[in-house]
């Protein structure tokens, strides 16, 4: 065990978690049994040179009444099913809701350590109690306290650096959800045309900001950042070499195609609604 711990030092490990994992944990908590204080589950992902990326998870049945009990047989069956579809995402740890790490957490962590062949599992906590009006998300790793390899005095959990890692598609969903951050109103996903308009508006704002920055540097009002300059130069070099007329034509054709898709989708919905009403009338 000490050999495993010496490999995964807190200063060498960074944990990255995808938003879908957090949403799955929250969904598990909402669907918990009556009277259950917290829920636990298995974390799935991979280790890339000290960067532990959590890509998925699934719930595990457990009980913390008189004694701790974890349905590890259920956990094994779920893991086997997952590995059939995603063989590159093995078990890397476990999650729990709440903000506390107690004695039961140590026992559950030992269960997962045994399931992982004595490797060190990652423990992810999600504070569903919203302490200080914040849903704290933290990652930990357990270490043994011992005077010699034969005996153990106990365990302690050290916190690890944690980042939320998102794909482009996930960003679109998160931006839509964030619209209701400061109010209680619901929101709906944008249509393709509205999403395109929003993206072009943001692009226009960023171009204005970059133009203003470059003009300020040229006038000597601010000092330029060489790293930013290199990044802008690399970005410009990556742009396709085409004149303005060709670019306008390509964009206009794309917009026309999108409008045609929107029109056909609306027409299809109307036809389906009419067909449903006719079918309902004939059945009566």
From Swiss-Prot:
One of its GO terms (molecular function) is metallopeptidase activity. SMART domains: JAB_MPN. Keywords: Cytoplasm, Initiation factor, Protein biosynthesis. One of its GO terms (biological process) is formation of cytoplasmic translation initiation complex. InterPro entries: eIF3f, EIF3F/CSN6-like_C, JAMM/MPN+_dom, MPN. Residues 15-146 form the MPN domain. GO terms for cellular component: eukaryotic 43S preinitiation complex; eukaryotic 48S preinitiation complex; eukaryotic translation initiation factor 3 complex; eukaryotic translation initiation factor 3 complex, eIF3m. The keyword Cytoplasm applies. It is found in: Cytoplasm. PANTHER family: EUKARYOTIC TRANSLATION INITIATION FACTOR 3 SUBUNIT F (PTHR10540:SF6), EUKARYOTIC TRANSLATION INITIATION FACTOR 3 SUBUNIT F-RELATED (PTHR10540). Belongs to the eIF-3 subunit F family. Component of the eukaryotic translation initiation factor 3 (eIF-3) complex, which is involved in protein synthesis of a specialized repertoire of mRNAs and, together with other initiation factors, stimulates binding of mRNA and methionyl-tRNAi to the 40S ribosome. The eIF-3 complex specifically targets and initiates translation of a subset of mRNAs involved in cell proliferation. Component of the eukaryotic translation initiation factor 3 (eIF-3) complex. This is Eukaryotic translation initiation factor 3 subunit F. The gene is eif3f.
């Amino acid at each position: 065990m000490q050999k495993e711990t010496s490999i995964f030092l807190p200063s060498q490990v960074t944990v990255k978690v995808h938003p879908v994992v957090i949403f799955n944990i929250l969904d598990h908590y909402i669907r918990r049994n009556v009277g259950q204080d917290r829920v636990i589950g298995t974390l799935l992902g991979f280790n890339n040179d000290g960067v532990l990326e959590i890509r998925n998870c699934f719930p595990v049945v457990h009980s913390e009444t008189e004694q701790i009990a974890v349905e590890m047989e259920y956990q094994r069956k779920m893991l086997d099913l997952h590995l059939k579809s995603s063989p590159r995402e093995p078990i890397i740890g476990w999650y729990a809701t709440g903000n506390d790490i107690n004695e039961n957490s140590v026992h559950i962590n030992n269960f997962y350590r045994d399931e992982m062949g004595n490797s060190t599992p990652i423990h992810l906590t999600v504070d569903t109690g919203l302490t200080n009006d914040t849903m704290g998300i933290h990652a930990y790793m357990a270490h043994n306290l011992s005077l010699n390899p034969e005996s153990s005095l106990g365990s302690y959990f050290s916190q690890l650096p944690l980042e939320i890692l998102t794909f482009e598609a996930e960003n679109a969903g998160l931006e839509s959800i964030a619209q209701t951050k400061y109010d209680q109103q619901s929101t709906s996903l944008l249509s393709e045309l509205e999403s395109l308009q929003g993206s072009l508006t943001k692009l226009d704002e960023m171009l204005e900001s970059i133009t203003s920055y470059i003009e300020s540097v040229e006038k000597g009002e601010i000092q330029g950042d060489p790293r930013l300059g290199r990044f802008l130069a690399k970005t410009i070099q990556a742009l396709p070499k085409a004149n303005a007329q060709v670019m306008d034509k390509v964009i206009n054709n794309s917009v026309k195609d999108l409008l045609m898709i929107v029109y056909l989708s609306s027409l299809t919905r109307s036809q389906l609604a009419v067909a449903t009403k006719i079918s309902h009338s004939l059945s009566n």
